[in-house]
């Protein structure tokens, strides 16, 4: 049984968010929350919020034990790029590309050995 949570159109670069996602992939939820709490990156609290939502979904929708959950999958997909103009000298303009991300967290129960 798997529980998931998805956050779409998050204003953070997918490349930078993937660096944080790689830290928690395969970890149990308590360890993942601790790692995200003390990671000093912009995407860490955003990913932590999605992880909390996935834990709540697992408890409420599937009656899973929150202490036995593992981050089985976490992936960051690219969202649409928001383009803005930046004025430059002599009447020119540059395009600023604000990247967005879709964050997906999938949890499963730890296998009993």
From Swiss-Prot:
What family does the database annotate? Belongs to the universal ribosomal protein uL22 family.
Q: Which domain of life is it from?
A: Bacteria
Keyword terms, alphabetized: Ribonucleoprotein, Ribosomal protein, RNA-binding, rRNA-binding
Molecular function per GO: rRNA binding; structural constituent of ribosome
Can you state the subunit structure given in the record?
Part of the 50S ribosomal subunit.
Keyword hit for RNA-binding: yes
Q: What does this protein do?
A: This protein binds specifically to 23S rRNA; its binding is stimulated by other ribosomal proteins, e.g. L4, L17, and L20. It is important during the early stages of 50S assembly. It makes multiple contacts with different domains of the 23S rRNA in the assembled 50S subunit and ribosome.
What protein does this entry describe? Large ribosomal subunit protein uL22
GO cellular component terms?
cytosolic large ribosomal subunit
Q: Which GO terms describe its biological process?
A: translation
Q: Which CDD domains match?
A: Ribosomal_L22
Q: Fetch the InterPro entries from UniProt.
A: Ribosomal_uL22 (IPR001063), Ribosomal_uL22_bac/chlpt-type (IPR005727), Ribosomal_uL22_bac/org-type (IPR047867), Ribosomal_uL22_CS (IPR018260), Ribosomal_uL22_sf (IPR036394)
- Fetch the Pfam families from UniProt: Ribosomal_L22
